């Protein structure tokens, strides 16, 4: 009887641990995202666009407000500053112990994205979404 109880307990623990795999890893669909910074090259100069709260870190940056929502394979980026909306799709390209990687296409342009927890020097963490698309490096954080 002890042997059967031990085997059942081991099986329950195994099932629980396997079902927990993947939990805690942020995914693109889990959040509404807000843009923190965008970097791109104009001529030979690196140009930053930034959210208002980043203006002290990037005083030369053009201030813009941009949001991103992803659901069911569809992605929408809204530039609140100019009223433009950009739409596209995303698919999982890989998973790793810390998060999920994606192939994305927005307005016909292909790129890459990744979602993971970023840990800061003070030990705090937040979900982040860096995107590389058509010469632009965009950095979003969970709202």
Predicted regions mapped to residue ranges:
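An anionic, turn-rich surface loop/hairpin at beta-sheet edges
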Residues: 51-58, 94-120
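N-terminal helix-cap/turn-to-beta initiation motif at the start of protein domains
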Residues: 21-43
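Glycine-centered tight beta-turn/hairpin loop motif at sheet-sheet or coil-to-beta transitions
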Residues: 81-83, 107-112, 133-137
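Sec-dependent N-terminal signal peptides of Gram-positive bacterial secreted proteins and lipoproteins
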Residues: 2-23
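N-terminal glycine/threonine-rich, aromatic-flanked beta-hairpin/loop signature
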Residues: 45-97
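Edge beta-strand at a domain terminus
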Residues: 85-96, 130-143
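Beta-turn initiation residues at beta-strand->coil junctions
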Residues: 37-40, 77-81, 131-134
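Short, hydrophobic/aromatic-rich segments at coil-to-beta transitions
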Residues: 26-34, 52-54, 71-76, 97-103, ...
